[in-house]
A protein has these predicted regions:
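Short amphipathic alpha-helices within nucleic acid-binding modules
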Residues: 20, 83-89
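Exposed loop/turn and edge beta-strand positions of beta-sandwich/beta-sheet ligand-binding modules
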Residues: 41-43, 72, 108
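Eukaryotic phosphotyrosine signaling hubs
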Residues: 4-6, 71-76
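Core segments of cupin and vicinal oxygen chelate
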Residues: 2, 8-53
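Helix N-cap motif at beta-to-alpha junctions
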Residues: 13-14, 81-84
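Vicinal oxygen chelate
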Residues: 31-34, 46, 78, 87-130
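Generic beta-structure capping elements
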Residues: 50, 58-61, 127
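Arg/Lys-rich, alpha-helical DNA-contact motif
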Residues: 51-56, 68
């Protein structure tokens, strides 16, 4: 038997990333420095959501490298209680939806896509049924 534990993405600004994911309903759990040979290589920031055991791990590397997003990454999907309210909170941070919320099929949930502060594409799915 296997369990899905976490998703890790690299970040460049922990404060902006924390504000973004907290606006989506995630809860900051803890941070942890990764130290090798006396040097701090990275800091991991862990977030949980709902009652799930799965966590989101945001990693800030301290080596000064820049990262290419590449074209293999798709998106992370997150269900939110109220899409309009969530988008309003994100707008306060300067985050806009790529396009207006829409339904994939008639009677289906509304959804839209946004980008987090590092450009990762996030799908937001409305649980409210609006």
């Amino acid at each position: 038997m296997a369990d899905f534990l976490h998703t890790m993405v690299r970040i460049t600004d922990p404060e902006k990333s924390r504000a973004f994911y907290e606006a989506l309903g995630f809860t900051f759990s803890r941070d942890m420095d990764i130290v090798r040979n006396g040097e701090r290589e990275a800091t991991n920031y862990f977030f949980s959501v709902g009652g799930s055991e799965n966590v989101l791990e945001l990693t800030l590397n301290h080596d000064g490298r820049t990262y290419d997003m590449g074209d293999a990454y798709g998106h992370i999907a997150i269900a939110v209680d109220d899409l309009d309210e969530t988008l309003s909170r994100l707008k306060e941070q300067g985050i806009e939806a790529e396009r207006e919320p829409y339904r994939v099929r008639e009677g289906g949930s509304r959804l839209c896509f946004v980008r987090d502060p590092d450009g990762y594409r996030i799908e937001l799915i409305d649980r409210s049924g609006k």
